[in-house]
């Protein structure tokens, strides 16, 4: 059987489960009203669109999305933008909100518990393989390649991993592997002595939060874990170390299945879990040749499409023309005679005359008043920035009125603006 037919048969036997219930507390006020996977990204998308698009483009058409924290925005997005799969062809996105299905006592207590509480639904679909995905990372990956790698290996679990510098290991689950990619150790966020990639002293393999299990093996693991009172019911902390101890875990390097892939191509994967990382990943897209290609017709990023007119850039009432460079602008935006560089504007943003905007991420339905100066600012949905406001130039004022990171990125929300207007 050739690889194409083999992959086709495999993904027909697989179901993906996207874990999208996390708050993402390190994003601070950006997740006050929405779960992290529902946060806007890249000018028109939501973070979860990347994992879901990877499923679709990989041929995985049976998908469950597990939700919990402030899920309304996420559920609405999925209902409006992801309802095109055909149920009669056994294609679906099944929304799985926390509903105390098992003991009527607990909401989801960890990533493993979130899957366990939907174990009856999983079993009803009868997949041979379960692909467990984090819904809060930015990357493009062909899961069918990882699935084929898993099926051919004979292991009962395969863990997606990405190469990182050893000094970053403290923030990830780190795995040690042998020459055959068998995972020999797994340490969640090691403070020191992180295992390195064979043949290197300064590079590590970090878990991507992507796991493929033989379904029966997964069910057994979850049923055993739920009875362990010492467990935190988390894949990284509890399930994967158990699998490693049973010699059943294979490492799958991201470079094998990233999109695009090949010699000289640096795999692009970002955990946008902090304001700085979120800002940087968005601005990556404003580069002349961004590492993440969102224009790839062969691997599109799908999302909800609102019917909007094209973006418009016009002179102000005095005839002053604006200058727009290295900037992404979504539908419905209108900019009057302003200078904008290295920025992203989501849908229905209005920038009035005389503004200077540099390295900013501006979410939908924001109005920027006349003569504002904004630098390294993330502006949440629906903000009305008063005329003449300066943000990003005075660290003391920024920290007093908004949230400012150590790297100087300023987060502005509607609540912050409203409170500032009341002073």
Swiss-Prot record:
Enzyme class (EC, first level): transferase
Gene3D superfamilies membership: Hexapeptide repeat proteins, Spore Coat Polysaccharide Biosynthesis Protein SpsA, Chain A
Molecular-function annotations in GO: ATP binding; glucose-1-phosphate adenylyltransferase activity
Origin superkingdom: Bacteria
Biological process according to GO: glycogen biosynthetic process
Pathway assignment: Glycan biosynthesis; glycogen biosynthesis
Keyword Nucleotidyltransferase: yes
Presence of keyword Transit peptide: no
Database matches in Pfam families: Hexapep_GlmU (PF24894), NTP_transferase (PF00483)
Keyword annotations of the record: ATP-binding, Carbohydrate metabolism, Glycogen biosynthesis, Glycogen metabolism, Nucleotide-binding, Nucleotidyltransferase, Transferase
UniProt xrefs under SUPFAM superfamilies: Nucleotide-diphospho-sugar transferases, Trimeric LpxA-like enzymes
Binding site for alpha-D-glucose 1-phosphate: 108, 173, 188-189, 207
InterPro entries reported in the protein's UniProt record: ADP-Glc_PPase, ADP_Glu_pyroP_CS, GlgC_bac, GlmU/GlgC-like_hexapep, NTP_transferase_dom, Nucleotide-diphossugar_trans, Trimer_LpxA-like_sf
Job of this protein: Involved in the biosynthesis of ADP-glucose, a building block required for the elongation reactions to produce glycogen. Catalyzes the reaction between ATP and alpha-D-glucose 1-phosphate (G1P) to produce pyrophosphate and ADP-Glc.
Oligomeric form and interacting partners: Homotetramer.
Similarity remark: Belongs to the bacterial/plant glucose-1-phosphate adenylyltransferase family.
Stated name of the protein: Glucose-1-phosphate adenylyltransferase
Species, as recorded: Francisella tularensis subsp. novicida (strain U112)
């Amino acid at each position: 059987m050739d690889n194409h037919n083999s992959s086709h048969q495999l993904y027909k036997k697989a179901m993906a489960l996207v874990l999208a219930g996390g708050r993402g507390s390190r994003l601070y006020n950006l997740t006050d009203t929405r779960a992290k996977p529902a946060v806007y990204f890249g000018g028109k998308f939501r973070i979860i669109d990347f994992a879901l698009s990877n499923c679709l483009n990989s041929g995985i058409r049976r998908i469950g999305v597990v939700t919990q924290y402030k899920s309304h925005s996420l559920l609405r997005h999925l209902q409006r933008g992801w309802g095109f799969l055909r149920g009669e062809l056994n294609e679906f996105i099944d929304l799985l909100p926390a509903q105390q299905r098992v003991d009527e006592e607990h909401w989801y207590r960890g990533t493993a518990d979130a899957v366990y509480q939907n174990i009856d639904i999983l079993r009803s679909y009868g997949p041979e393989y379960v692909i467990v995905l984090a819904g809060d990372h930015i990357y493009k990956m062909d899961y069918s390649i990882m699935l084929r790698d898993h099926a051919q290996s004979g292991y009962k679990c395969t863990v997606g991993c990405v190469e990182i510098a050893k000094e970053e290991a403290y923030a990830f689950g780190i795995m040690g592997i042998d020459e055959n990619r068998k995972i020999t150790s797994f340490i969640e966020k090691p403070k020191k002595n992180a295992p390195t990639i064979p043949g290197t002293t300064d590079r590590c393999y970090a878990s991507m939060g992507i796991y493929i299990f033989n379904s029966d093996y997964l069910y057994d693991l979850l049923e055993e874990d739920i009875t362990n009172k010492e467990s935190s019911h988390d894949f990284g902390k509890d399930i994967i170390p158990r699998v490693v101890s049973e010699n059943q875990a294979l490492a799958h390097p991201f470079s094998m299945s990233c999109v695009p892939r090949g010699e000289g191509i640096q795999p692009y994967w970002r955990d946008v879990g902090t304001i700085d990382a979120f800002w940087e990943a968005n601005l990556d897209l404003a580069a002349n040749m961004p590492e993440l290609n969102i224009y790839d017709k062969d691997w599109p990023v799908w999302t909800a499409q609102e019917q909007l007119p094209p973006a418009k850039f016009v002179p102000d009432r005095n005839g002053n023309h604006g200058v727009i460079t290295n900037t992404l602008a979504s539908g419905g935006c209108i900019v009057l005679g302003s200078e904008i560089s290295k920025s992203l504007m989501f849908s229905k943003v209005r920038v009035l005359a005389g503004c200077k905007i540099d390295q900013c991420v501006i979410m939908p339905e924001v109005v920027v008043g006349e003569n504002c100066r904004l630098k390294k600012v993330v502006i949440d949905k629906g903000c009305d920035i008063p005329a003449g406001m300066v943000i990003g130039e005075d660290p003391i004022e920024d920290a007093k009125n908004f949230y400012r990171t150590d790297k100087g990125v300023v987060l502005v929300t509607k609540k912050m603006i409203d409170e500032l207007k009341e002073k």
